[in-house]
Amino acid sequence: MSIELDLQLAVENEHGLPSEAEFALWLSRTITPFQPQAEVTVRIVDEAESHALNLNYRGKDKPTNVLSFPFEAPPGMEMDLLGDLVICRQVVEREAIEQNKPLQAHWAHMVVHGSLHLLGYDHIEDDEAEEMESLETEIMQEMGFTDPYLAEKE
């Protein structure tokens, strides 16, 4: 069982970012219960790139915390490539402050959330959102973090 991480740091300042080992751990804890072998690219970007991708792929004219791009192999081809996560540093940092969450916990949550999207989970419908949030909470707590949705539940 292993998750292969391709970490891309496309930010002006890399200081204070989680380590490659932390990203790998968060991916592994999220993905391996569902898929024991996988390759995932995690790209950390600044707001301009996040904004452009969010506008191009989702029609949203603003940067966002995490974008997930699942990979679909052509029929008959078996590949471990799960997909790409694009995480915006400034949005994650701003949200952590606004939501009064430890920064490291919010980074972990974005990796967990994005990874579940790569695995096919979504939160468009209420029942899907409930299932996905429950999984996120369980995974985060298994890693020693608090429930990322605690403030919303109070």
UniProtKB/Swiss-Prot annotation:
Location (main, coarse): cytoplasm
Cofactor: Zn(2+)
EC id: 3.1.-.-
Compartment(s): Cytoplasm
Protein name per UniProt: Endoribonuclease YbeY
NCBIfam families given in the database record: rRNA maturation RNase YbeY (TIGR00043)
Coiled coil spans: none
Gene Ontology cellular component annotations, sorted alphabetically: cytoplasm
Highest taxon of source: Bacteria
Organism of derivation: Vibrio cholerae serotype O1 (strain ATCC 39541 / Classical Ogawa 395 / O395)
Function: Single strand-specific metallo-endoribonuclease involved in late-stage 70S ribosome quality control and in maturation of the 3' terminus of the 16S rRNA.
Gene3D superfamilies: Metalloproteases ('zincins'), catalytic domain (3.40.390.30)
Biological process, per Gene Ontology: rRNA processing
Family in the record: Belongs to the endoribonuclease YbeY family.
Cofactor binding comment, as recorded: Binds 1 zinc ion.
